[in-house]
Amino acid sequence: MIELLKEDDAPKKIGHIQFGLLSEDDIVRLSHVQIVNRELFDLVKRKPTPYGVLDNKLGTSDKQAMCTTCGLSIVDCVGHFGYIKLQLPVFHIGYLKNIMNILQMICKSCSTILLNEEKKQYYLRKMRNKKMDNLQRKSLLKKIFLECRKTKECLKCGSTNGMIKKSGAFKIIHEKYKGKTESLQDYYALYDDAIKYNPEMKSHIKKAQDDLNPLVALNLFKKISYQDIEIMNMDPVIGRPERLILTYMLVPPVSIRPSVPMDGGSGTNEDDLTMKLSEILHINEHIRSNVDRAEMSAIMEDWDYLQASCAIYINSDVPGLPLQMKPTKAVRGLSQRLKGKTGRFRGNLSGKRVDFSGRTVISPDPNLNIDEVAVPQLIALTMTYPERVTDYNIERLQKYVINGPDRHPGANYIIYADGVKKWLKFGNREKFAAELKIGDIVERHIIDGDIMLFNRQPSLHKLSIMSHKARVMPWRTLRFNECVCTPYNADFDGDEMNIHLPQTEEARAEATILMGVTNNLITPRNGEPLVAATQDFLTASYLISRRDAFYERYRFALMCTHFADANEHIDLPPPAILKPVELWTGKQIFEVLLRPSVKSHVLCNFETRSRTYSKNLYMCPKDGYVYFRNSELMCGSIDKSIIGGGNKNSLFHILMRDFSPTIAANCMTRLAKLCARFLGDQGFSIGIPDIKPAEDLDRKKREIIETAYKKCAVFLKDYESGSLQLSSGCSMEQTFEAKMNQTLSQIRDDCGKLCVNDLPNYNSPLIMGLCGSKGSNINIAQMICCVGQQIVNGTRIPNGFTNRTTPHFKHFAKNPKSKGFVSNSFYTGMIPTEFFFHTMGGREGLVDTAVKTAETGYMQRRLMKALEDLSTHYDYTVRDSIGGIVQFIYGDDGLDPAGMEAKDRPVDFLRAMMSVKSTRQCRNEPEMKPFEIRKLVESIIDSSKFEACTDLFKNEIRVFFNGNEKTKGYIQELISLRKQFKLSSFDLNDNEDEIIIEDNSPMDISTTTTTTTTTTTNNAVKITNITTDIEMNESNKEENDKIEKERIEKEKESKRLKLLGERFANEHVVNQIHRITKTQIELFLDICLDKYSRARIEPGTAVGAIGAQSIGEPGTQMTLKTFHFAGVASMNVTLGVPRIKEIINAAKNISTPIITASLNCDYDIRSARIVAGRIEKTTLGHVATHIKEVVKRAGCYLSIKIDKNFVDSLQLEINSKTISQSIASTKGLKLKPEQITTNGDYKLRIVPPANIREGSLYYLQFLKNNLPAVIVKGIPTVNRVVISKVDEKQERYQLLVEGYDLRAVMATPGIKGTHTTSNHIMECENTLGIETARNTIMSEIDMIMTSHGMSIDIRHVMLLADLMSFKGEILGITRFGIAKMKESVLMLASFEKTTDHLFDAAVHHRQDDIVGVSECIIMGVVIPLGTGLFKLLRKSNKNNLPKKSLLLQD
């Protein structure tokens, strides 16, 4: 019989979630039983009590028991709800604020909203507008609330309405009787007689309040009209206000509050919710039994207890609970189960524990490929992959089934087509294998080549989880190639890592393409390579490629086999030295490594300076200029800058960009194998002899320290005598410390240079430092020479004892040794005081790291939450999850930061041209002239194939060829080079074959050549004749003079001939190198177009998440310190994590607000001082020599004298008149202008008023204390102004203003307002608008990253700035800012203030459409990013489609 109807078990996608409030009927309808019994268990039957909070109708938590409602066991029954009917209504603690707001908005007598009819209709129309988003509705509701609060009398019934306030934890009072309205006067008149007999009553009448208990509030809410409810942004059908007050309570299923049996069966441990529900039932029963017979006070007390118990059940952290109502032990309410890191949202919905994962310690294995991970056999036997049986794999899977679960490669389970699952531990496996059919699923062991996700926590960026291919190996650790350490930030000192096994073919495909190591060699932060050679590999590469590294044939061939697989064909290059014995250089190893066979198409071309470069390019004495031509290493030693990470000019980055990531990964694998074997065979170690300084080195070190000590002694002497020249804006102390710090810190750097120059070439620490594998010059200097000055918080060691650092030194000692200078090295060992200072310096680093981890972790979480759902769409816009446009085109050019070859640009034109000219010589083609080059370039750029490119990119190509005001173009370089060699050159606009010689006159080449030849012949004849004449007429003096004269002429002629010969010889060489043909230009432009196309951002890219990680991840490498402003020791500026935190928080108050002000007259220091005086806050206390009281018989007054010298030295534009105006305008002093008299320019007199209440002398004391703080000049919010040099070479100045009020600074005479900037984002927004604030965010973050030596693509910063400003105001990435940016309830609930957002959503009937990242993860829906952005339509056969019936057809 055919099954007509089959139950559809296919999972449905949840379209949206509607939040609302449950009515009494809804609660009863949802429930299966009313709970009335407070007893938990029937002690006789040892079963849950019927109608109790553990009734089996609610489900079961016992493995043996069955649910009496659905008849299922604990595994299948999800549980059922019950309800408790409360005898008296209580406030829902989650809605208490909403209840108070509604009570404030309505009349407390007739329940009408406190608005007139006109406004009511206006706001109703607004609220019914479907286009308004939640943020606008919230803003409108706030406006309505404020308007209602101002209304004191109801416009309908005339009742008085006052303020609604909260009293205690959950009592609401109505201050009805405060105010002076007519109705209140009538109310007070009622008590006139009572006051006569009891006068004390008068003070209490105005304190009278209405107690709005839940019963009163419930009755008021029931009377609110439908229209008024809509105005309050609530739903009149599913969200009426009376539902905010609890009359019925839902009892959750037993499965979420299970009973845990105690050992020995002596009882159970009950959940907090169960006990609280039992307590509510008990109080409820007590109220029911006492409601008719008990006193009102007893009932009210029980009611309060019921309210408290219900509140604690919902939220156990209720503030303001009376002591007697507080639970004796901590209780976890419903809110506590949802919020926090371990709550339901973050702990179980947004992130959860997974199956098919493993974790163990990691260790290195250089013989593995870059994209492989060695999986221990123990893990491979446990983790399985469900492979479906097909015609192609049935034989292999049959073998796995026969091997079973204990033998690798085997299988653990078979899942048949009918859903039956069979374990292969027992039974006849041969039979099972024979019965295997197409379509069955075999859960087999991990085998070589399986795709696995590899992850190390903390996962700070995208590259912290990548996919590798499994390689099953013995032993118990996960192993991988050390080149992949950097993206994971892994080391092998005991780190553990996780592996995950994707369970579907689709997941494997996505993991391979999107997360594969080969496809993620570069970081999306800035396009630099992260997967690269490291440590030992760098040391070995440096040793192999050094000068004078020669290998005989057998050794060279052996080294080639080290990096090659057995089946790889290798062609040895010709030896560098043929006689007396064939020798190959170490540089040739790299040639074979890049291009093992001559058939390989990998022709790598680039040149760069390595770490050891000193001078003379190719002839660098330290072999520091690396030149690769067609994959041959011509010169240079290989070090970190060539094969390490973080450098766009590195070998692997160029291989990846010019060829493919696979070729780069293969070369990296070969290098790892070679270096590991090379160091294993040759050996490389470090020991005590390596760091033992030679006598000469020790002597030079002592000389350096003595010289520095002498300088310090001079500074100390000048400081003590007061003759030290002050730095700009610094005190004597600050200047002295800055100079000492600079001098002593320089010692360590000098010692580092000394070590590099004096240590032998074979010194191991030196080799590691030079090649960049480990350590630096400073580390070497500390080991061998001197540990150096210890710094704590940016300064020398502060005084810990009374006026000294430790008791070992004299009081007020400031010499180097007493303030933390360590002259010994680690080799010689430190004395106790030096060791103590050294620990202080080290401790600061440890504390800084510990604090920084928590700070950056929270910062990155906030960034991720704000940016996670931003992605590029098919129109290249960047939108959020609800379709709001954040950027019209990503990064203003639509390019991917990961595809940037040059600094923020997609093509490195110079290197691309070099590569083209090296690989395509085109010797038979004629060279192109400048006007031809320009014409060809323009025609290709304007053609159809460049249509997809932006104008910006096209202009970059034009600038590369033609140049602009700032840079010389390629054509100009070509011409200037020919001129440099004194060759024929072409003018940029010439169209004819003209040659320009020294005298700039045109000349035909053939004529020049003929003339030269003739002249040479004639000269030869002349020379012969002269020699003959000398022999014949030696005695003749006149003849001798003539001969001498002709000899001089002959030398001049030969020099000219030599110069001309060199010129034509050079021309041939230069023409071959510095020429360009049509084919080369066409190929160059094709390469540029190809690279540009690859660099375009793909639609669906999660640019928001990548941007958040790119900004957050470098934060871990920053510090928490405050640094000095460049060039000004005293001007501190906050950098690092605290500054980024200020920026993304959009903080209104920042730690170091600095306005950089340009001057109209920026070359005159006197003018700068005058303008600084106008800005800097100057008080009367600063400029007055004295403020003293004068008492005479005629009266008393205050005498003020101004310090003329001080005013003149600071160029202050003040006198007694301006000061008197400032004093008179100061609030709080209560002085009138006529009370202040002036005597000349520098004296004032203040007379107290005659009718002063407290007496003249007291008033004078008051003035004397407050007058020094009166601001007489400058901007009140500016603390100080420092004059700094813009450029050290040119005497140009600018002002650094510490403080706020950008507008006032810009308006100050002498300031160039258009060139004045502030680092305060909110002030920029208020003064200059949102666009300036956006640019400030970008420039500030870029400055912070640059100051820490980090590079971050500007597109990431741009996206953050656009997100913070796209709503029309600057919103911080905080819980308040994100709430204004985002609409989704689930997303906001999964971030912070979980229950607040849920309660608010319920009150205002919010709807969550589940389109953002967080919501989709919570609900198990495909995220609409990347491969989830689009849907596929299957192409169907039109002939098989059913015919559609016509509209009016029956």
From Swiss-Prot:
Q: Among its keywords, does the record have NAD?
A: no
A molecular function (GO) term? metal ion binding
Q: What is its EC number?
A: 2.7.7.6
Which region ranges are annotated with the description Bridging helix?
Answer: 832-844
Endpoints of the signal sequence: none
Q: What is its main location?
A: nucleus
Quote the subcellular location field of this record: Nucleus
Q: Which domain of life is it from?
A: Eukaryota
Catalysis: reaction(s): RNA(n) + a ribonucleoside 5'-triphosphate = RNA(n+1) + diphosphate
Asked if Cell wall biogenesis/degradation is a keyword of the record, the answer is no
> Which residues are recorded as binding Zn(2+) 2?
C107, C110, C154
Q: What broad class of enzyme is this?
A: transferase
Example of a GO cellular component annotation carried by this entry: mitochondrion
Which keywords, in A-to-Z order, does the entry hold? Answer: DNA-directed RNA polymerase, Magnesium, Metal-binding, Nucleotidyltransferase, Nucleus, Transcription, Transferase, Zinc
The record, for Gene3D superfamilies, names: 1.10.132.30, 1.10.150.390, 2.40.40.20, 6.10.250.2940, 6.20.50.80, RNA polymerase ii (3.30.1490.180), RNA polymerase II, clamp domain (4.10.860.120), RNA polymerase Rpb1, domain 3 (1.10.274.100)
Q: Which GO terms describe its biological process?
A: transcription by RNA polymerase III
- Residues reported to bind Zn(2+) 1: C67, C70, C77, H80
Positions annotated to bind Mg(2+): D491, D493, D495
The record's comment on protein family reads: Belongs to the RNA polymerase beta' chain family.
How does the annotation summarize its subunit structure? Component of the RNA polymerase III (Pol III) complex consisting of 17 subunits.
Question: What's this protein's function?
Answer: DNA-dependent RNA polymerase catalyzes the transcription of DNA into RNA using the four ribonucleoside triphosphates as substrates. Largest and catalytic core component of RNA polymerase III which synthesizes small RNAs, such as 5S rRNA and tRNAs. Forms the polymerase active center together with the second largest subunit. A single-stranded DNA template strand of the promoter is positioned within the central active site cleft of Pol III.
Under what name is this protein listed?
DNA-directed RNA polymerase III subunit rpc1
Species source reads Dictyostelium discoideum (Social amoeba)
Gene that produces this protein: polr3a
